[in-house]
A protein has these predicted regions:
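Aromatic-lined ligand-binding clefts that engage carbohydrates, nucleic acids, or primary amines
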Residues: 1, 12-14, 110-137, 164-166
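Short beta-strands within extracellular/lumenal beta-sheet-rich domains
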Residues: 1, 100-112, 149-151
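Signal that preferentially marks extracellular ectodomain short beta-strand elements
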Residues: 1-4, 25-26, 151-154
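Surface-exposed, short loops/turns at beta-strand junctions within beta-sandwich domains
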Residues: 4-8, 156-160
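An acidic-aromatic loop/edge-strand motif
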Residues: 7-103, 126, 163-222
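Residue-level preference for beta-strand/loop junctions
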Residues: 102-104, 145, 160
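Short hydrophobic beta-strand segments in globular cytosolic domains
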Residues: 141-142
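A short, polar/charged loop-to-alpha-helix boundary motif
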Residues: 145-157
Length: 222
């Protein structure tokens, strides 16, 4: 769709024939009465999410606010904006990357004097990614996956300019969800993605919200 997106509102329309054979509807009806019938339920056709890929940021139209278990929440909607060239430490997801999934490399060049290159480390108060890697002046360090959240910089720094690169790898949580629960869940199932499901949730999902809940990720320095 490059070259077809315009400034302002854009509408993407997909047209298809969506039908299910009669036995699917019969099984759904049986699921209301017999719990075991859920194991026989599948769909010949499914409607999946549409993912927009590209070099851009996503800015929430409403403010973010904290939620449970290191998550945060916004009422939405969202606007595409140019990708940032710089980010601040802390939660990067609220800096126009709420749905971002994959790897992000952050780099900074610092200048050190003679007495500033010894006994140095990079420490984090908590993990802000699944894996955090570091390269100091091109030298790769062992990645962080668990505590202690610390990179030892002994022997890697020199007087003058030093290039520090941090590579964050996150998971699919903020892309695949569940996005419409009021915080971060300890466990999820089919009902976590549905507002009202008599089959998988026993009725109305009381934790449902029309807003969006994400999990934080970023650089949380100690």
């Amino acid at each position: 769709i490059s070259g077809k997106i315009v400034k302002g509102d854009n509408v993407i329309t997909l047209v298809t024939d969506f039908v299910q054979p009669q036995h699917i509807y019969d099984t759904i009806k049986d699921c209301y009465e017999f719990e075991a019938m859920r194991n026989k339920l599948w769909y010949d056709r499914e409607i999946n999410e549409l993912y927009l890929l590209g070099d851009f940021g996503v800015r929430a139209d409403k403010a973010y606010r904290p939620a449970s278990n290191r998550s945060f929440y916004t009422d939405g909607g969202f606007t595409l904006v140019p990708a940032r060239e710089t980010v601040m430490d802390g939660n990067i997801a609220v800096q126009d990357y709420p749905f971002y999934t994959g790897k992000m490399t952050l780099e900074k060049t610092i200048t050190l004097a003679d007495g500033e290159i010894e006994n140095r480390s990079i420490e984090f108060s908590r993990m802000g990614a699944v894996i955090t890697k570091a390269r100091i002046n091109g030298k790769a360090l062992s990645p962080l996956t668990r505590a202690p959240y610390r990179f030892d910089l002994s022997g890697l720094l020199h007087t003058g300019k030093n290039k520090i690169e941090l590579e964050l790898t996150n998971n699919f949580r903020n892309l695949l969800g569940p996005l419409h629960l009021g915080g971060e869940s300890y466990s999820v199932g089919p009902a976590s993605f549905q507002h009202d499901s008599k089959i998988f949730g026993g009725g109305l999902n009381r934790g449902w919200t029309d807003g969006y809940a994400f999990l934080e990720y970023g650089l949380f320095f100690k």
